């Protein structure tokens, strides 16, 4: 149940307002061309840290008409199947002491199985160039590091 504007509209604009996607081939608009008819989409933020969820909700509340959050990735599939989601921000690490990003990559693969066109932005505090490349090669739309800069 993905919002049709994702797959049918081919105009190129940033996905998340201030969180600009660098992969131009996957920039999918969430708003109509007319500023008077702005249609904001729905974002799903998945992170085990409640502080990160709250911070991203505050940061993105003016960019999206609806913000859904999940504190565990096992909620993703159910949410995607029952709600129209336009973009996902997905943490890469959920288990204590593990910071290799494999959990996030696993869930990215699961998302791609049921929603191949859904933009997924990977989020991690343990990022490096190698992990970013790995995420993008696994079809992530973009890669963000924690902490992020709200001004950009």
What does each model-found stretch correspond to?
Residues 2-10:
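Glycine-rich ATP-binding loops of the HATPase_c
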Residues 18, 23-44, 57, 72-74:
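Non-catalytic signal-transmission and effector/linker regions of two-component phosphorelay proteins
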Residues 50-69:
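Two-component/phosphorelay signaling modules centered on CheY-like receiver
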Residues 68-87:
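Acidic, metal-coordinating helix/loop segments flanking the phosphotransfer/catalytic sites
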Residues 97-116, 134:
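Short amphipathic alpha-helix used as the core "switch/output" element in two-component signaling
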Residues 129-130, 144-152:
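C-terminal output helix
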